[in-house]
Design a protein with these regions (language model features):
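Amphipathic alpha-helical segments in well-structured domains
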Residues: 55-59
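Residue-level detector of short, conserved catalytic/binding motifs and their immediate flanks
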Residues: 23, 60, 142
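Catalytic cores of nuclease domains that cleave nucleic-acid phosphodiester backbones
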Residues: 1-45, 70-76
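Metal-dependent nuclease catalytic regions and adjoining charged, substrate-binding loops involved
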Residues: 8, 49-54, 64-155
């Protein structure tokens, strides 16, 4: 749990907003450094399947929490990848650092919280500005339930 200061002009209540996230595992090594561990499954383990998490909001959030919980004794984030296809294997390594992204991530959270406050109380989901993304609008399991509504509007 982290309390993040609100942006100037944010209409939400209080001086901070709550940001929560759940880690798979949090450990301390023999030198006393704290690590946040996340488990991921994959059909292949390559350097690109590791690097894709470097700028992921989930992992940037882990770094925010790790720094808050452990301070200078934060070791980082460990990704424990388990290969599902034969031959089965696993790979455990620390995530590449992204210090600028971690700094910017807090600002992104503030911006999102400000946007949520701005549009709170609207009647329907279509009263919000849409977010257009091939990752959101049409995922690997098919289109979002509002895909056609975003395409054509409410006719």
């Amino acid at each position: 749990v982290a309390h993040i200061p609100r942006m100037e002009g944010d209409t939400g209540e209080g001086d901070t907003f709550l940001y929560t996230q759940r880690a798979d595992l949090i450990v301390r090594d023999v030198q006393g450094f704290g690590w946040i561990v996340d488990h991921k499954t994959a059909y292949r383990i390559t350097s690109s399947t590791l690097r894709q998490y470097c700028l992921s909001g989930q992992f940037l959030g882990y770094q925010v929490f790790g720094r808050k919980m452990f301070g200078a004794k934060f070791g980082g984030v460990i990704l424990n990848r388990v290969k599902l296809a034969a031959p089965h294997q696993f790979d455990r390594c620390s995530l590449e650092p992204a210090p600028q992204a971690v700094t910017d991530f807090v600002g992104t959270l503030k911006e999102i919280e400000s946007r949520i406050s701005k549009y709170a109380g609207r009647e329907t989901g279509m009263d919000f500005p849409p977010v257009f993304s091939d990752q959101t609008c049409y995922g690997k399991y098919g289109p979002c339930p509002a895909f056609e509504l975003c395409r054509w509007g409410d006719e």
